[in-house]
Amino acid sequence: FIIYKGIGVINWKFLTSPPSDGMTGGGIWPAIVGTFYLMIGSALFAFPVGVMSGIYMNEYAPKGKLVRFIRVMTNNLSGIPSIVFGLFGMALFVKYLGFGDSILAGSLTLGLLCVPLVIRTTEEALKAIPDSYREGSLALGATKLQTIRYVILPMGMPNIITGLILAMGRVSGETAPILFTCAAYFLPQLPTSILAQCMALPYHLYVIST
């Protein structure tokens, strides 16, 4: 239904031109670029933090109550409404750290939103690798770090990448976090700095629909 009703107005000009006439005309190019910037920024934050945390939890952390508690808290973070992350991002990044409404603040907030998913995906990917590979690598004289870097991570990377793609899919559709941290109502020019505001497709759709 959406494709049937919308295909008549979707063309190259609509996709590559800025909005005009107070959002009643023009296209969505700045919103596309802004969404892309936010996805890249959140990935640059969430991927290293989430993957390294997942590696530590699965490969280094001693099994016990503390690890179980951290896993429970990580799962709970996945269930927190996105608007709570938005308010937290506004308080921490926009106000306390002084980033203001910016791509940087929005990217970090969205990164926090998807870190739990990346952690859990990384853990599950590493758990699926049989211990025989670890034992064989160690028996050949490799250190634990070398085993993780050259044996475990390459085997688990496809599933880890899948988790990152799922996280980016969630990030690309979130409105509440960027509402408080970076989204601009009408900004036909493309942002030139990570400390500038940007338009974004989820917020743009919200504005148009309301």
How should these model regions be labeled?
Residues 51-71, 102-152, 163-167:
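Membrane-cytosol interface at the C-terminal ends of specific transmembrane alpha-helices
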Residues 20-22, 26, 178-210:
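Interhelical loop and adjacent transmembrane-helix boundary motif
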Residues 5, 17, 54-59, 91-95, ...:
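Transmembrane helix-loop junction
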Residues 31, 35, 72-75, 79, ...:
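Residue-level signal for discrete positions within transmembrane alpha-helices
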Residues 28-55:
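Transmembrane alpha-helix signature in integral membrane proteins
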Residues 75-112:
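Generic hydrophobic transmembrane alpha-helix motif, especially the helices
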Residues 1-29, 33:
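N-terminal, non-cleaved signal-anchor transmembrane helix
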Residues 43, 144-182:
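Transmembrane alpha-helices
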